[in-house]
A protein has these predicted regions:
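NAD(P)-binding Rossmann-fold cofactor-contacting core
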Residues: 27-42, 174-194
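N-terminal glycine-/charge-rich "phosphate-binding" loop or analogous flexible N-terminal tail
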Residues: 4-46, 52-53
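Glycine-rich adenosine-cofactor-binding loop
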Residues: 8-18, 24, 151-171
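Rossmann-fold NAD(P)-binding glycine/threonine-rich loop
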Residues: 101-118, 241-285
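Glycine/serine-rich phosphate-binding loop and adjoining beta1-alpha1 elements at the start
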Residues: 2-3, 62-152, 281
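Rossmann-like adenosine-cofactor binding region
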Residues: 51, 66-73, 84-91, 191-266
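A short helix->loop->beta-strand "cap" motif at the edges of active sites that frequently abuts
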Residues: 29, 89-96, 113-115, 175, ...
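Residues in the short beta-alpha loop(s) of Rossmann-like NAD(P)-binding domains
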Residues: 14, 37, 103, 183-184, ...
Length: 289
């Protein structure tokens, strides 16, 4: 039975959800949470004693992005063991669920039960806003991982999707040269019309040796052994594509190349900014309903 004591109920989450809670409380909403712990969490947020209490206490449920990393547990900043299937079984037709990167099995269940839901990471405007934190975090990671400046360097971005585009435009003001190599002819054309240098994907191996920084956004193996062999010894390779990424990491380590799969950046970098645009979209959707 839904009691609906609070405007919002947060289940699990990271720093983005902590800042979302604080902002919502600051503008007068009531909030309860379960599995969300941090010293800066506003003490007006009421901690639920159980998952069941959290779910039945609010019609609007906010979950993490991604909701789960292993498909079994809801991601949490606490040590609580929050089972995804237990959470789903507590939902009713009166609930509306927000979160990100919902599993196909979860969306199928919600649709079958007629429960309203919204996956933030299926919303174009949020994906674009998210690309800001992703690109800035990627640049920060590159800077602290390298022995040289971005200034006067040569950078290559593999792919030219949303995150790659934002990253490319930010790098342009920092690097001597930013080139794009994309498998898609449309993406290559988009890079060219944005005045970036373009490298044909089938010419990657013969051109790779000039780059100081390589950023991969393609979620399949593109940085093969053959290509890695031709990279500079001091190259920094940052892979922000979905796991397992697009780099042969074991071989990169074997030959002494720095390569790192760097994921979940908006949860690590500028979470307060991410929380602001998530709340903006959330409240807009609530008002519509």
């Amino acid at each position: 039975m839904l009691i609906n004591k609070y405007d919002f109920s947060f289940v699990g989450g990271d720093m983005r959800q902590v800042y979302m809670v604080n902002e919502l409380l600051a503008i007068g909403y009531s909030v309860t949470s379960y599995g969300l712990e941090n010293p800066i969490l506003d003490n007006r947020c009421i901690a639920a004693s159980s998952l069941k209490e959290a779910v039945i206490s609010g019609k609007t449920i906010i979950t993490p992005i991604p909701i789960s990393k292993d498909g079994i547990h809801i991601q949490s900043s606490s040590s609580m063991d929050i089972k995804l299937d237990e959470f789903l079984n507590l939902l009713t037709l009166s609930h509306q669920v927000f979160g990100g990167c919902f599993l196909p099995s979860m969306t199928s269940y919600l649709m079958e039960k007629g429960i309203s839901y919204e996956d933030f990471m299926e919303v174009e405007e949020i994906i674009l806003y998210n690309s800001i934190a992703t690109s800035e975090g990627t640049i920060a990671k590159a800077i602290i991982s390298s022995t040289i400046n971005l200034h006067d360097s040569h950078a290559l971005i593999l792919g030219f999707g949303r995150c790659a585009r934002t990253l490319a435009h930010k790098l342009r003001s920092l690097c001597k040269e930013v080139d794009i190599s994309a498998r898609s002819r449309v993406q290559s054309a988009a890079a060219y019309t944005s005045s970036f240098g373009t490298i044909p994907f089938d010419k990657l191996e013969e051109n790779i040796s000039k780059y100081d920084f390589i950023f991969n956004t393609i979620p399949s193996l593109v940085m093969t052994k053959e290509i890695l062999d031709r990279t500079k010894e001091q190259v920094v390779i940052i892979d922000i594509a979905s796991a397992p990424g697009g780099v042969d990491f074991s071989y990169a380590k074997e030959i002494g190349r720095y390569a790192e799969l760097y994921l979940g950046i908006p949860g690590k970098i500028s979470p307060k900014s991410s929380a602001t645009f998530l709340n903006h979209y959330l409240l807009e959707q609530i008002r519509k309903k």
